[in-house]
């Protein structure tokens, strides 16, 4: 399986980067404290897909915010940037489930193809997508470097 090493140090809080891995986009977001708090405040029964969909936890684990990140590094969220409905690429900092301050939204994703909304942990909240955005296998090599794959 192909791997890719990523340096997280240049990604500032509130910023998201997109990179290509195995021919698909991967979103890496340095989440704000408010984005993390919002994700943790969601009750499991409110989720359309209650399964974590993460290669880093056992299959079937609940979609808690803790199960969507690796270890105690909750500020970085790594996910495949492919909508689980029909494979479009969602837009970041959009949708109805991010942190809204004034007229700006931070965190959250919106798929423009058919209207799926994902929250600040990449969990499907509304729209036709059946599952949460998938979290690929990754590990921390250092405090600021990860290996995906």
Give short role names for the model-derived ranges:
Residues 16, 29, 38, 121:
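Short acidic, gly/pro-rich beta-turn/loop elements at beta-sheet edges
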Residues 1-24:
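C-terminal segment of N-terminal export signals and the immediately downstream linker at the start
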Residues 26-29, 148:
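Short hydrophobic-aromatic micro-motifs
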Residues 30-49:
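Short, surface-exposed, low-complexity cationic segments
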Residues 44-149:
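Rieske [2Fe-2S] iron-sulfur-binding domain
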Residues 8, 21, 29-30, 80, ...:
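Pocket-edge structural micro-motifs
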Residues 18, 27, 137:
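Short, surface-exposed charged micro-motifs
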């Amino acid at each position: 399986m192909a791997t890719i090493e990523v340096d997280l140090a240049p990604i500032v809080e509130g910023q998201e980067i997109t990179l290509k891995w195995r021919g698909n986009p991967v979103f890496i977001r340095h989440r704000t404290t408010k984005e993390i708090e919002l994700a943790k405040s969601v009750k499991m029964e409110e989720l359309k897909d209650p399964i974590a969909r993460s290669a880093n936890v056992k299959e079937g684990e609940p979609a808690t915010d803790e199960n969507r990140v690796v270890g105690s590094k909750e500020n970085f969220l790594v996910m495949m940037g492919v909508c689980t409905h029909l494979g479009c690429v969602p837009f970041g900092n959009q949708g109805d489930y991010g942190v809204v301050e004034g007229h700006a939204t931070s965190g959250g994703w919106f798929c423009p193809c058919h209207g799926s909304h994902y929250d600040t942990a990449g969990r499907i909240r509304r729209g036709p997508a059946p599952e949460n955005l998938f979290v690929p296998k990754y590990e921390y090599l250092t405090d600021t470097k990860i290996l995906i794959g």
